[in-house]
């Protein structure tokens, strides 16, 4: 993997709780909070400055801007929610350029697993464990925070284990 194990290990304890929070709130309320996105961004801005070479740090910050602009366009087109776009932008700097192909495969697998699990639980008695979740009522929308948060968390875990 292109991400260094050291960077992944430093990011992981701060980022993983946010990923879990985003997955939970998106399933429960169908929204990703601005606070979660801002904290995720702040963690990278603060830790990344010490963990990455300065030129890499700046390129990764640029990826945040690029993903945010693309996300805004996709949101305006009705393809994705605003919270999803903001979270993807805040998550972008954590991803090493050399890991993009791996990330896409990881995201697709996570998205399929999240969709199958969420839809499967929706139609089983397990739904009674959280009967008030808004995502159960949605027919056309899916809580992408479940897949996005899981993808970033798994990526950092894999980076900590197998990073360069």
Where is each model-derived feature located?
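A membrane-topology feature that recognizes alpha-helical transmembrane segments
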Residues: 1-164
